[in-house]
């Protein structure tokens, strides 16, 4: 493809020339997540088109229509049929494993959980596929004793509540020095508790629903585990009553090391605040 350039250089001994050429890797398998279905899809599809690769894309079963719409738009603007192929399914493992083991596949790119990523790496080892893995995270947010607490709270809101926490880049645990933990937690809880929860189509709503009831139940399980082991919910701490998969923005104080929540990716509007001394 004309956009993918190689490299020319003279060897250190000056006697030879080194030429690197880049070629399409070949048919590429792509697995995209539900939390940013178009953004995650386009960042994989765009480079593949530029490089001259054909693709098989398997979108998350929760959000298949976004990828189907994108494929239709690309065909309408001239992408040849067969370059981008979309496979929708609610049985991802059964569908993807034969594709991964197919000798025609050359590369696999996946955005999703670490657990699924490990399985995909294992399956792809038979074919020695080239891999691009963007897996889950457990990002810490640190507040030291000399911090500007108001600025720290403002930063914590941005870090936690992007996409209501349903993002691998969201801060997942807030380690706060014990000398400022009470002030930080109180102000953080006040900001979180003041957020308006509801349908995203309603003006003024700041926190929408989680993706599924299963996701909401998983978030609540982590919260209840922490509370049972001694944590305190300064705000929230439970699903929002009524229809929908809403969960109240939650700040947990006095989170013990034995709780699951600091060590697992929450993927929801829950902020555990364990403390440290040095």
Annotate the PLM regions.
Residues 2-6, 196-199:
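Short amphipathic alpha-helical interaction/hinge segments
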Residues 269:
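Glycine-rich nucleotide-phosphate-binding loops and adjacent flexible coil segments
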Residues 107, 115-256, 275-278:
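ALDH superfamily catalytic-core signature
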Residues 66-70, 167, 265:
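Short acidic/histidine- and often glycine-rich active-site loop of Leloir-type glycosyltransferases
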Residues 262:
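Short, solvent-exposed loop/beta-turn-alpha elements that line the ligand-binding surface or hinge
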Residues 20-23, 43, 100, 168, ...:
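A generic fold-level signal
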Residues 3, 7-151, 276:
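Rossmann-like NAD(P) dinucleotide-binding subdomain of oxidoreductase/dehydrogenase enzymes
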């Amino acid at each position: 493809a004309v956009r993918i350039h190689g490299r020319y250089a003279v060897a250190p001994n000056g006697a030879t020339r080194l030429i690197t050429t880049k070629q399409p890797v070949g048919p590429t398998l792509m697995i995209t997540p539900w939390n940013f279905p178009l953004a995650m899809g386009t960042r994989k599809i765009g480079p593949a088109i530029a490089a001259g690769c054909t693709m098989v894309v398997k979108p998350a079963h929760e959000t298949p229509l976004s990828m189907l719409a994108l494929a239709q738009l690309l065909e309408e603007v001239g992408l040849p049929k067969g370059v981008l192929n979309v496979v929708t399914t609610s049985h991802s493992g059964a569908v993807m494993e034969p594709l991964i083991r197919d000798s025609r596949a050359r590369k696999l790119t996946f955005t999703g959980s670490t657990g699924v990523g490990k399985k995909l790496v294992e399956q792809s080892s038979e074919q020695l596929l080239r891999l691009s893995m963007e897996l889950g995270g457990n990002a810490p947010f640190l507040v030291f004793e000399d911090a500007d607490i108001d600025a720290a709270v403002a930063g914590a809101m941005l870090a936690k509540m992007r996409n209501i926490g349903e993002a691998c880049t969201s801060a997942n645990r807030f380690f706060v020095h014990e000398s400022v933990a009470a002030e930080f937690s109180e102000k953080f809880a006040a900001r979180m508790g003041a957020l308006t929860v509801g349908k995203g189509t309603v003006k003024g709503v700041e926190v929408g629903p989680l993706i599924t009831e299963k996701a909401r139940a998983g978030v609540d399980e982590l919260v209840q585990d922490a509370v049972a082991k001694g944590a305190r919910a300064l705000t929230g701490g439970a699903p929002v009553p009524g229809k929908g998969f809403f969960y109240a923005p939650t700040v947990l104080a006095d989170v013990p090391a034995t709780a699951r929540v600091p060590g697992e990716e929450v993927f929801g509007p829950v902020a555990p605040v364990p403390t440290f001394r040095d």
